[in-house]
Regions:
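Cationic, low-complexity basic patches in intrinsically disordered or flexible, solvent-exposed regions
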Residues: 10
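GST-like domain detector, emphasizing the conserved glutathione-binding G-site
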Residues: 13, 18-161, 165
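Conserved beta-strand edge residues that scaffold enzyme active sites
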Residues: 55-56, 200, 245
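Terminal-tail/helix-coil boundary detector
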Residues: 237-250
């Protein structure tokens, strides 16, 4: 585990001038969805300590040390004073509620006003990212990986055939439907909730990265690719990437 204390650049459109009493800690697993937490913190200019954890080289799972932070042993997890918070969506909402109230400029829409179309879009994408889309992306990764694992040579052809059939009949059609839906939505929305970047874009960012890294042809999804380009071009995203490392396992 590596520990790094970061003091992000003061954000001209974030929370410059807001007093931060306690150092927030991000428990960051390499190549995981916790990257979006770093991105939000960099956008807001919130100081934080970054604790980086490496995946098990064989299982690719989180190391057991994370269970000392939270019983589930997963990432992302943050500690902020006496608070320990897990799950990406819950963490993002907490950070915006606590540190994003004074966000200005293009971050002013992080939390759309209740009752607005932008609010309803934000709520939908906050749930859809992990509740639906990431399920298919994780299944895709699992069924691509299984045939590459050690097994008796006579079992490998069966495993390869079975995994290919599951992908063709179940995973790939559902992923195609999901990505087509995202592409159509981004045809009429610059960001997922509307004209301004919102918390929904941070939540959706990892799923978009994963989809484009795991086989979605950017030429078939130009609007999805353009969303990713806008996201990656942001200086705060680049700072988060430099500190957290590559985003997804390919």
């Amino acid at each position: 585990m590596e520990v790094l204390t970061d003091f992000p650049q003061p954000a001209s459109n974030g929370i410059s001038g807001q007093i931060i009493h306690a150092m927030l800690t991000v428990h960051h697993l390499e190549r995981s969805g916790s990257q979006r937490i770093l991105w939000l913190l960099e956008e807001l200019g919130v100081p934080y300590t970054l604790k980086r954890y490496k995946r098990d080289p064989l299982t690719k799972l989180a190391p057991p040390e994370l269970k000392a932070v939270h019983p589930l042993g997963k990432s992302p997890v943050i500690t902020d004073g006496d608070e320990t918070i897990a799950e990406s969506g819950a963490i993002l909402e907490y950070l915006v509620e606590r540190y994003g109230a004074k966000a200005q400029g293009d971050l002013a829409g992080l939390r759309p006003a209740p009752g607005t179309p932008e609010y309803r879009q934000t709520r939908f994408w906050m749930h859809y990212a992990e509740g639906s889309l990431m399920n298919w992306l994780v299944m895709k990764l699992v069924f691509v990986t299984i045939p590459t694992q050690p097994m008796p040579f006579f079992v490998r052809p069966i495993a390869r055939q079975l995994c290919a059939k599951v992908q063709a009949k179940l995973i790939d059609p559902n992923l195609a439907t999901a990505l087509a839906y995202l592409e159509a939505h981004l045809d009429t929305h610059a960001w997922f909730a509307g004209k301004q970047i919102s918390i929904a874009d941070f939540q959706m960012s990892f799923a978009v990265e994963a989809a484009l890294a795991r086989g979605a042809d950017a030429r078939q999804f130009p609007r999805l690719d353009a969303f990713r380009a806008r996201m990656v071009a942001r200086p705060a995203y680049q700072r988060a990437l430099a500190k957290g490392g590559p985003v997804v396992m390919s």
